[in-house]
């Protein structure tokens, strides 16, 4: 572990060791991270799990750290987390003793491991219900001071146990760094702000604090599709300011899966725009954009006609007609779907082509033929409307 003058090279994600995942699943996810040129992970240590099973828990963490490192990925473990604090009770000396024993054990086990980039002493000390649901705004400064006193002592513990280690605190807002900046080596802030102007202002404040203190910067959490903080916008501004970043988080799953995550557990991706942004390619938001013309060569006519033909009754003799299989209908529907998706005329989070693949994976006898016909009809109708076809 060695302090760097700049961490602008960091392309990180938040990604936790999970005892419920098989080694094969862990490897799949880390292989995807390596392909995305991720070079660091930030994850939460859990004191309670260590206290329950010291060796077993740290074996899990060590295995995760070394698997990451084998893929060229460093680790930033977080000792403690401020988010669950709903009520503040001054830690007793026994509490502090337990915290110190936990930190000492982690530092002894992992402190000299080349896989460790730095220690994050505490995640978001002031982002919790103790502050956010304070019944009287006049009490907020006192509550902030209580938490400040606690996190500073935590910093002192880690520094005393690892004098040469690299320390940061993952603050929710850049201005929260004023409470610990004298105790850490790296300025760390999180950014879930809602507009480009707000994000730019934060980076300017961060750069000013970095220049004032002579300490490098890191954005250790960012990106959320539910907070007006899209990954591609955030990454564009990160890259413009040459600040290293950690996206929250690698895998779309669990509690946060509906608004966070860049890949699914099977290695498929949520949004190609996120992946493109990670490599410096961004949507065009200036003049000169070209409106797609899905029917320029008449292929929309052909796709719609294919659906009309497959849904029509084709008489072969009196009272008889040619049977159209579900495969025939899906094949015709796919022509409309491919045009709709390629021109981004349908919601890309719920791809119609995914429904086609789900039906094709079913045995013919188990498919809902009426639902497939309705789907094909809807896709052709939608393409007609977009192409202004009567």
Predicted segments — roles?
Residues 11, 213-218:
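Short, surface-exposed connector motifs at secondary-structure boundaries
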Residues 300-310:
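Disulfide-bonded cysteine-rich modules in secreted/extracellular proteins
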Residues 195-205:
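Substrate-binding surface in catalytic domains of secreted glycosidases
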Residues 309-372, 377-390:
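Long, low-complexity or tandemly repetitive, helically biased scaffold regions used
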Residues 191-196, 250-251:
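Short, acidic/turn-prone active-site loops that include or flank metal/cofactor-
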Residues 2-184, 222, 234, 241-245, ...:
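Active-site mouth of glycoside hydrolases
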């Amino acid at each position: 572990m060695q302090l760097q003058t700049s961490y602008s090279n960091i392309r990180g994600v938040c990604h936790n060791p999970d005892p419920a995942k098989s080694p094969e699943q862990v490897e799949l996810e880390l292989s995807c991270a390596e392909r995305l040129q991720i070079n660091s992970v930030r994850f939460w240590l859990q004191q309670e799990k260590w206290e329950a099973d010291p060796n077993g828990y740290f074996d899990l963490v060590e295995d995760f750290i070394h698997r990451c490192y084998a893929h060229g990925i460093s680790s930033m473990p977080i000792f403690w987390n401020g988010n669950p604090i709903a009520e503040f009770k001054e830690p007793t000396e026994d509490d502090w003793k337990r915290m110190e024993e936990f930190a000492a054990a982690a530092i002894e086990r992992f402190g000299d491991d080349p896989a460790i980039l730095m220690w994050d002493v505490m995640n978001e000390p002031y982002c919790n219900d103790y502050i956010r649901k304070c019944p009287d705004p006049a009490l907020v400064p006192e509550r902030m001071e209580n938490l400040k006193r606690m996190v500073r002592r935590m910093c002192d513990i880690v520094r005393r146990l690892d004098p040469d280690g690299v320390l940061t605190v993952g603050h929710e807002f850049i201005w929260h760094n004023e409470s610990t900046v004298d105790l850490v080596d790296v300025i760390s802030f999180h950014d879930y702000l809602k507009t480009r102007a707000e994000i730019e202002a934060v980076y300017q404040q961060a750069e000013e604090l970095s220049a004032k203190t002579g300490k490098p910067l890191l954005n250790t959490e960012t990106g959320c599709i539910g907070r007006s903080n899209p990954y591609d916008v955030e990454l564009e501004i990160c890259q413009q300011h040459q600040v290293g970043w950690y996206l929250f988080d690698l895998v779309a799953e669990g509690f946060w899966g509906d608004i966070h995550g860049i890949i699914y557990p099977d290695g498929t991706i949520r949004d190609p725009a996120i992946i493109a942004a990670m490599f410096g390619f961004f949507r065009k938001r200036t003049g000169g954009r070209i409106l797609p013309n899905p029917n320029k060569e008449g292929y929309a006519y052909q796709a719609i006609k294919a659906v009309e033909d497959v849904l029509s009754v084709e008489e072969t003799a009196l009272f008889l007609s040619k049977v159209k299989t579900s495969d025939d209908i899906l094949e015709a529907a796919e022509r409309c779907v491919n045009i709709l998706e390629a021109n981004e005329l349908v919601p890309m989070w719920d791809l119609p082509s995914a429904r086609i693949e789900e039906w094709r994976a079913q045995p013919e006898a188990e498919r809902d033929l009426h639902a497939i016909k309705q789907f094909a009809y809807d896709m052709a109708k939608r393409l007609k409307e977009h192409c202004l076809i009567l």
